[in-house]
Amino acid sequence: MSLREVRLSTTPTQEAINDLRLGDIVYLDGLMYTAREGVYMRALEQSANIPMDLPQDSAANFHCSPAARINADGSFDMGAVTATASFRFAKWLPEWMEKTGAKIIVGKGGMTSKDYKEFFVPNGAVYLSTVGYGTGALLG
């Protein structure tokens, strides 16, 4: 299998997603938001407002550790991020994709083939696996 390097917008066209192939090395261009269990629960189970215009601002959700620090002026600083296992989000994904328009989910560990067939394929979405711990530092 030959590996391709692909640039993908975080507000991708369906054609760009459909053009991806297994094994592609994908670089994301644009804004990506983090959300894990707490955000999913508040947004979906408690109907909390999402403070972004999704998917206009971004259709890329990174499953990772809480990563932002709120500054006194209300801005945010991003520290280091650590991917978290995406299989834990499966029960929320259909509703999450519908509510947010998410087309790109980034995380670690992948999902089951059933999840891909039930959630990603019907929504024209893609799952991207991150590199392992410490690999980012190794690669520079």
Model-derived segments and their meaning:
Residues M1, R21, D53-D57:
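A generic structural signal for short, non-catalytic loop/turn and secondary-structure boundary residues
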Residues T34-G140:
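Feature captures the catalytic cores and cofactor-binding loops of soluble hydro-lyases/lyases
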Residues S2-P12:
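Short, structured beta-strand/loop micro-motifs enriched in basic residues and often containing a Trp
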Residues T10, G30, C64-P66:
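Pocket-edge structural micro-motifs
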Residues Q14-D19, P51:
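Short, surface-exposed secondary-structure edge patches
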Residues Q14, I25, L31-A35:
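Short, charged beta-turn/beta-strand-edge "cap" motif at the junction between a beta-strand
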